[in-house]
Structure formats: structure tokens, C-alpha cells
From Swiss-Prot:
CDD domains: ALDH_SGSD_AstD. HAMAP family: Aldedh_AstD (MF_01174). Belongs to the aldehyde dehydrogenase family. AstD subfamily. This is N-succinylglutamate 5-semialdehyde dehydrogenase. Coiled coil: none annotated. One of its GO terms (molecular function) is succinylglutamate-semialdehyde dehydrogenase activity. The gene is astD. It comes from Yersinia pestis (strain Pestoides F). Its EC number is 1.2.1.71.
Length: 505
């Protein structure tokens, strides 16, 4: 707790921007981060204004040639040193993430471990997806190489403030790009501590730059002529805004990883508690603040489905919630802010007014805290269900009669991130694979389960395909194809119409 108290003493003028290898005080407005549980101030500094953002982009541009020309081994050495420092500082960084996000400590430890694992996976992805290959073609060689874009802007989210931006920063740097990192204004402290580790790892000046702030800072960064691409993780609302802002600029690479209105289909309930455990993990892990969380729980009508829902509701009601460091450890903490808590309660009320039936009422035990209890609402009888991602611990139940109807309901969304099936019928899963409009399709596993060794992303309003996890490498380098021949000789057979049977000049 001493770390928490010490940080409260930091003045608003503390240097929270990292530009050209130096920590600087921003020229923008002062903003702060509060503990979601206690509303106590954790962090305060000044945001980056347009001048700061321009300076960061210029620094990244100036640093690009040398970093891009460095060997892969040289770049990998710095990145591997960063991973080693993450290992050394795993507990302190996990505590920082817990304080900012309210996620339990056991969960944030796994987040930092995922950051460490991302380095080895990114090296593998670089070689597999964007490496160097040669194909003989007679007297020549077809060679495929990949080149970095240049300056990439990375926009990070608040739900995984360490792991998700790390999943773009690491492959971007490995490919030879330089980066301007703009984290969520709701998790500035995690970003600052992470960049300090990059500095200790020996990242060259200007290769990685940090600009802090909210919407104004983000818009200034997206509008910079000096960026060659933008990698974004966050809400569909913000992603759409960035897409419009960069419209008409096809020369800039835009990678959007957004949210989902994901469906989990409970078709069979053989082991009731095993199914309930999976169904609890899917909507309520991280207080429902994962893009892959199930927002819709599709349950087959009948006695088996009724019994499952009763057990599911009882287990959800008994979930331990609380502060990140409480013992025994809680399953989930608060949502990210009081404003987020208010939005979730408003969403629940809206669904009830539309005709939904509350199976478990989501509540806010303390009006001064962003802590919410899990909520379950049956929306089967709502004629026009809002196609929204409610980013918190609220799941909507929809009853269905047969599997064909379940598939139809699952696809009734503009999003296309994740869908899951609980069933022991392999043929049903094969049918789901054929008909699902989603980038992630899980079978008898929580929707929130995903592998960094696989592509991650969705279609529709969930983003432009796979800008995260293993395929992030694709967005960090562009392919360069070459036909190469060391010695030029006249072909034995000439093209029709060409003759060299001419008088010598």
C-alpha cells in the first residue's frame, strides 16, 4: 500500500510524456486517474497537446532510419531485455495494473506474464508471417522480404493496459518501426511504468514515445501527417471515429481491434456445474470488461435449460467481488470508473423498460465506488433488442427452441468477434464453424479463452480482421517482392518482334 500512498503525492507537473528519450511535462490540460474502488487519486499529470504530439512524431520519424537498418538480432536484443525487466518487475507492475483497473491481483499477474510471453511469440510470428523467403525461377530468384511502415501510432485500451498495447508495440518495434504510444486516459500510470522499463531496456531515443491524454490527444495523433499507420484497440465507437478521420488516406495502414456482442450457445448440459463454470467465466471475468465476453447467453428451452439457469444465477449471485488485494481473493473487482458503472446500470434499466425480466439484478453496493454485482436479464420477449456491447458484468439471456434458431440469433449482430458452443455434438460445432460470422469460434471453452499463438480479431463492427495476437505481424510490415538475377545475359529465345540481327553500330 505504500506504493499507492507515495504515488498520490506526485504533483500534477510531473513529467509523464516520454519523447526523444526524455521525460517531459505535457503542455495540455491536467487530468487525473482515480482508484475505481475508492475514488482516491492515483495519478495526475498534464496531457500532451498538439505541439507535444507533433514533437513525438518528429522524434519517431528521425529515429526510424537507424532503427529500421539495425539487424533483427539487434532489435530483438532490446526487446528481450524488456521481457527480462518485466519478469523482474512482474509483481510491482501487476499491482499498478490492479490499482488502475481494479482487476484482482491474481488476474493482473497473468496479464504481465502474457506481456512476457508476447516477445517469444512475436519473434516466431515475424519469421512465420513476415520473414524472408526465396523461390528459384530458372536463372533467377523470386525473393520475398518485408519492410517496416515507418512511424506507427499505437492506441491502447484500459481493460488490458499492459498486455494489449504490448501486443502491438512489440511486433511493431521488432519489424523496425518506431512508435508513438497513446494509452487510454483511464490507465496512464500503467503506460508510464511500462515505458520506464523500455527505457531501462535500452530502447534508442525516439524509437518509442509516449503521449498521455484523452480524446484531444488521440485526435491530434491520428491527424499527424508523420504517421504511416495506426493500430487501435478499443470501443467500436472510437474505432469508427478513427476510421472516418483517416478516410481518404489509403497510404496509411489502419488496424482496428474493437468490441463484440458475443453469443454463447448452451445447447447441452451434461455436467451442469462444468457448464455453469464456463458460463460464469464468459460474461463476468474482468467484471465483464473483455471484448470477448459473452453479452448474450443463448439457452435452449426445456427442463435442462431451466435447471442450468437456476444454477447459473445462484453461482453468479454468490461470486466474491471486492478490492484487488482482498483475501480471500475476489473473482472480480470494479469496472473502470464511476461513469462506466452508471452506464451499466442505465443499460440494465433500459433493457427492463423494453420488457426484459431480471433474473439477477445488477447493483452498485456503494455509490462512491465503481464496484458492481453481476447482472442477468432475460430478453427473450424483447421484440427489438439493442445491438450494443454493454461493457460490464451484465449478460442477456435468450431462450431458443432448436439449434437452427440459435445460429440465427447468434448472427443477428453487426459485430463479429466471438461465438461459442456448449455441446458434445461435433456436427453442431462443424455447422457453427460454417455459419458463424465471427473471428473466434470456441467449442466447450469460455468465450474469453484465446491463444496468442493464433490470430485474434473479428469482422463487421468488431474490426478489420486480425490486427492482434499472431497476425499483428502482418500489420507491422509490408511485403516487398523481387525478381533477382546476379548476371544479365541475352535470352536464348527472344520475344516475338525483337531482333538483334542488325548492322553493328
Amino acid at each position: 500500500m505504500s506504493q499507492h500512498v507515495m504515488f498520490n503525492a506526485v504533483l500534477s507537473s510531473h513529467p509523464a510524456l516520454f519523447i526523444q528519450g526524455e521525460w517531459r511535462i505535457g503542455n495540455g490540460v491536467s487530468f487525473e486517474k482515480q482508484d475505481p474502488m475508492s475514488q482516491q487519486r492515483l495519478w495526475q499529470a498534464r496531457a500532451a497537446d498538439h505541439t507535444d504530439v507533433t514533437l513525438a512524431c518528429h522524434a519517431a520519424r528521425a529515429a526510424f532510419p537507424a532503427w529500421a537498418r539495425a539487424s533483427l538480432e539487434q532489435r530483438a536484443t532490446v526487446i528481450q531485455q524488456f521481457a527480462a525487466l518485466l519478469e523482474q518487475h512482474k509483481q510491482s507492475l501487476a499491482r499498478t495494473i490492479s490499482l488502475e483497473t481494479s482487476k484482482p491481483y491474481w488476474e493482473t499477474l497473468t496479464e504481465v506474464q502474457a506481456m512476457i510471453g508476447k516477445v517469444a511469440i512475436s519473434l516466431q510470428a515475424y519469421q512465420t508471417r513476415t520473414g524472408h523467403s526465396q523461390t528459384p525461377m530458372g536463372d533467377s530468384m523470386s525473393v520475398l522480404r518485408h519492410r517496416p511502415h515507418g512511424v506507427l501510432a499505437v492506441f491502447g485500451p484500459y481493460n488490458f493496459p499492459g498486455h494489449l498495447p504490448n501486443g502491438h508495440i512489440v511486433p511493431a518495434l521488432l519489424a523496425g518501426n518506431t512508435v508513438v504510444f497513446k494509452p487510454s486516459e483511464l490507465t496512464p500510470w500503467t503506460a508510464e511504468e511500462t515505458v520506464k522499463l523500455w527505457q531501462q531496456a535500452g530502447i534508442p531515443d525516439g524509437v518509442l514515445n509516449l503521449v498521455q491524454g484523452g480524446r484531444e490527444t488521440g485526435e491530434a495523433l491520428a491527424a499527424q501527417p508523420d504517421i504511416d499507420g495506426l493500430l487501435f484497440t478499443g470501443s467500436a465507437h472510437t474505432g469508427y471515429h478513427l476510421h472516418r478521420q483517416l478516410a481518404g488516406q489509403p497510404e496509411k495502414m489502419l488496424a482496428l481491434e474493437m468490441g463484440g456482442n458475443n453469443a454463447l450457445i448452451v445447447e447441452q448440459v451434461k455436467d451442469r456445474d462444468a457448464v455453469v463454470n464456463l458460463a460464469i467465466q464468459s460474461p463476468f471475468i474482468s467484471a465483464g470488461q473483455r471484448c470477448t465476453c459473452s453479452r448474450r447467453l443463448l439457452v435452449k428451452t426445456g427442463a435442462e435449460g431451466d435447471a442450468f439457469l437456476l444454477r447459473f444465477t445462484a453461482v453468479a449471485q454468490a461470486l466474491r467481488i471486492g478490492r484487488w488485494d482482498e483475501q480471500p481473493a475476489p473473482f472480480m473487482g470494479a469496472v473502470i470508473s464511476s461513469q462506466a458503472a452508471e452506464r451499466m446500470l442505465a443499460a440494465q434499466q433500459h433493457l427492463l423498460l423494453l420488457g426484459g425480466e431480471s433474473l439477477l439484478n445488477m447493483t452498485r453496493p456503494d455509490s462512491q465506488s465503481a464496484l458492481l454485482t453481476p447482472g442477468i436479464i432475460d430478453i427473450t420477449n424483447i421484440s427489438e433488442v439493442p445491438d450494443e456491447e454493454y461493457f460490464g458484468p451484465l449478460v442477456s439471456v435468450i431462450r431458443y427452441t432448436d439449434f437452427t434458431e440459435a445460429l440465427k440469433i447468434a448472427n443477428q449482430t453487426r459485430f463479429g468477434l466471438a461465438v461459442g458452443l456448449v455441446s458434445e455434438d461435433r456436427q453442431q460445432f462443424e455447422q457453427l464453424l460454417l455459419e458463424a460470422r465471427a473471428g473466434i469460434v470456441n467449442w466447450n471453452k469460455p468465450l474469453t479463452g484465446a491463444s496468442s499463438a493464433a490470430p485474434f480479431g473479428g469482422v463487421g463492427a468488431s474490426g478489420n480482421h486480425r490486427p492482434s495476437a499472431f497476425y499483428a505481424a502482418d500489420y507491422c510490415a509490408w511485403p516487398m517482392a523481387s525478381l533477382e538475377c546476379e548476371h544479365l545475359t541475352l535470352p536464348a529465345t527472344l520475344s516475338p518482334g525483337i531482333s538483334f540481327d542488325l548492322p553493328k553500330v
